Amino acid sequence: MISARRLGKRFGRKRALDRVSFDLAKDGFLLVTGANGSGKTTLLRLCAGLAAATSGELEVRARREEIGYVGHEPLVYRELTALENLTLFARLYRVPAGEARVGMLLERFGLWEERGSRAGDFSRGMLQRLALCRALLHDPELLLLDEPYNALDARGAEVLDRELKDLAGARTFVVATHDPDRVSALATARLAFA
């Protein structure tokens, strides 16, 4: 599903990625580890089509609408409620039976009781859970998760563990994390940045 050959990205004089190569088959799970500033986020942004490489080749065999992405900062509208956020994205993604899917995801991620609350009033962990719901809303083939456990409380982390285990092998994942032990058993490929 993803092939990278000598992939590079520079920001001015700073080299964010240098000659990264890997292949990830459909339904594979790539675990990306490394220190802060090592290029994990840059790699995910390139795979999501949010940035362009400055060298090398990258082939992502998924259309934009088949990709779910969760970055460092949860992409949600803080002035909208949890329900309004997901309903809006369901319309944007043209999700069939969007109402049912929205309700199911809010329930699975422990946000059903908070569905009428403004996202701006949520804790960082709740915002992360809402962003994960948004990323899963359109049932994407490829999920790109940048530090998905960041700011999750114990309940949120357990929910994410369950979701990843349920979807592993049926979806393609690229997960960048400082906590590789949580998802190590799911990985079919690994990429470690220095």
State the predicted function of each range.
Residues L143-E147:
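Catalytic Walker B motif of ABC-type/P-loop ATPase nucleotide-binding domains
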Residues A48:
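Helix-to-loop junction immediately C-terminal to a conserved catalytic motif
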Residues T87, A97-E114:
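Conserved ABC ATPase "signature" region
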Residues T33-A35:
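The feature captures the beta-strand-to-loop junction immediately N-terminal to the Walker
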Residues L132:
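Hydrophobic anchor residue at the start of the ABC signature
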